[in-house]
């Protein structure tokens, strides 16, 4: 056991010497990109191989080599090999982690891109549909703007223009018939003048109709008085004629057709 402790101390001293020599070599070759000994650790693969080789040589030449020491050496070497395997697996896992994370990130990004593309296409489709509906509504709406001379906006505007042309023609006829209307007047003023003129004509017609009614009733009364007078004169004439015939002695067969 004491021999093994001495061997362990010798191995540590040798490992430190090897590490110092490797560090010095790395300092001399800083410009070499293939060597990165600044982060070199005694537990790396090269150091372990050197340590094992030197340990085997020391065991072979060490006096008083015993089976116990050989067993200790085998256990130590197996421990170092297992540690080396663990380090390799850790390195592999660390190397695989960025790949897995990058693949997962790329998958998530692809899914996000697909979702964003679908959302964008849906929004674009809705926007185009809404724009088309707005254009259809604008086409169905009536255009109230004034068109240029000789042009028209749509059928409704054409019909409206024809209607306004007829109204203007009737207004010009009224201007010619109604005194006091001028072309320079506005539409409202001209309509007021026409209304006043029509009201005055209505009043005149009512007054004339009243006078005509009074005149007609007076004419009917005079005609009845004249008829009575004529009948009375005819009766008197007939009476005189009958008296004359009676004096002459001729019979009278004449019957009067007049009645009172």
Swiss-Prot record:
Residues 118-139 are annotated as: Disordered. It is found in: Nucleus. Residues 151-201 form the bHLH domain. Gene3D superfamilies: Helix-loop-helix DNA-binding domain. Induction: Induced by brassinosteroid, auxin, ethylene and cytokinin, and repressed by abscisic acid. Insensitive to gibberellic acid. PROSITE patterns: BHLH. One of its GO terms (cellular component) is nucleus. Keywords: DNA-binding, Nucleus, Transcription, Transcription regulation. Its main location: nucleus. Positive regulator of brassinosteroid signaling. This is Transcription factor BEE 1. It comes from Arabidopsis thaliana (Mouse-ear cress).
């Amino acid at each position: 056991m004491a021999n093994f402790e001495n061997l362990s101390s010798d191995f540590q001293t040798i490992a430190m010497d090897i590490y110092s020599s490797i560090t010095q070599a790395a300092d001399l070759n800083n410009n070499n990109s293939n060597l990165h000994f600044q982060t070199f650790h005694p537990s790396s693969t090269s150091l372990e191989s050197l340590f094992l080789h030197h340990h085997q040589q020391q065991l072979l030449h060490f006096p008083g080599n015993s089976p116990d020491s050989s067993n200790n050496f085998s256990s130590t070497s197996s421990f170092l090999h297992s540690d080396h395997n663990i380090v390799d697996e850790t390195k592999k896992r660390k190397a695989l982690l960025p790949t897995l994370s990058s693949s997962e990130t790329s998958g998530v990004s692809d899914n996000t891109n697909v979702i964003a593309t679908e959302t964008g296409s849906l929004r674009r489709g809705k926007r185009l549909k809404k724009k088309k509906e707005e254009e259809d509504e604008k086409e169905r709406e009536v255009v109230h703007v004034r068109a240029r001379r000789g042009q028209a906006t749509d059928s409704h505007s054409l019909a409206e223009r024809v209607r306004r042309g007829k109204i203007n023609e009737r207004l010009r006829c009224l201007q010619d018939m109604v005194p006091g209307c001028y072309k320079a007047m506005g539409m409202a003023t001209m309509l007021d003048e026409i209304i006043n003129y029509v009201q005055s004509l209505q009043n005149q017609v009512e007054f004339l109709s009243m006078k005509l009614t009074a005149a007609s009733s007076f004419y009917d009364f005079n005609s009845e008085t004249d008829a009575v007078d004529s009948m009375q004169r005819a009766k008197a004439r007939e009476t005189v004629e009958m008296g004359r015939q009676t004096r002459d002695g001729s019979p009278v067969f004449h019957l009067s057709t007049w009645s009172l």
